[in-house]
């Protein structure tokens, strides 16, 4: 695990709160991951506090699924996470806004499948902390 990830986990009290920047709790087999918020990893984005959010692996995968399917919704979620990064804490209002976007995505794409025929919205993607 990168040092910035550890530092952010402490600063944002991820373990104490029991949820990540998208309102997901740690599930069996999940790990803590660093998500690039402003400058993507593919564009050489730094692993720096100002450019990151801490996500568990399952919601991190889900966020990139949303990015590929509905870029506007991805941007809405990212905007809320940037706001929390700037504030320096996980704000319940931002988390509820993220949950609203995720719920809307799940309504719009319910039953959708990938090009390979796999379910787009896995069951574990819908298991979020009730805030």
What are these regions (language model features)?
Residues 2-33, 56-58:
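Short cysteine-rich loop/turn motifs with clustered Cys
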Residues 12-13, 74, 86:
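Broad structural signal for hydrophobic residues in well-ordered alpha-helices, predominantly aliphatic
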Residues 21-54, 65-67:
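Histidine-centered nuclease catalytic patch
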Residues 40-55, 77-91:
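Short microdomains enriched in Cys/His and/or Lys/Arg
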Residues 52-76:
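Short Cys/His-centered divalent metal-binding micro-motifs
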Residues 84-131:
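Short flanking/linker segments adjacent to small metal-binding domains or redox-active Cys/His motifs
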């Amino acid at each position: 695990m990168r040092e910035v990830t550890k530092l952010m986990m402490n600063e944002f009290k991820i373990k104490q709160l029991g949820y990540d920047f998208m309102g997901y709790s740690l599930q069996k087999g999940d790990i803590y991951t660093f998500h690039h918020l402003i400058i993507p990893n593919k564009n050489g984005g730094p692993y720096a506090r100002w450019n990151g959010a801490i996500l568990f692996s399952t919601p991190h995968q889900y966020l990139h699924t949303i990015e590929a399917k509905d870029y506007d919704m991805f941007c809405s979620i990212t905007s809320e996470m940037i706001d929390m990064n700037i504030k320096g804490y996980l704000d319940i209002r931002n988390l509820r806004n993220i949950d609203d976007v995720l719920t809307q995505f799940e309504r719009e794409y319910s039953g959708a499948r990938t090009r390979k025929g796999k379910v787009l919205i896995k069951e574990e993607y819908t298991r979020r902390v009730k805030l």
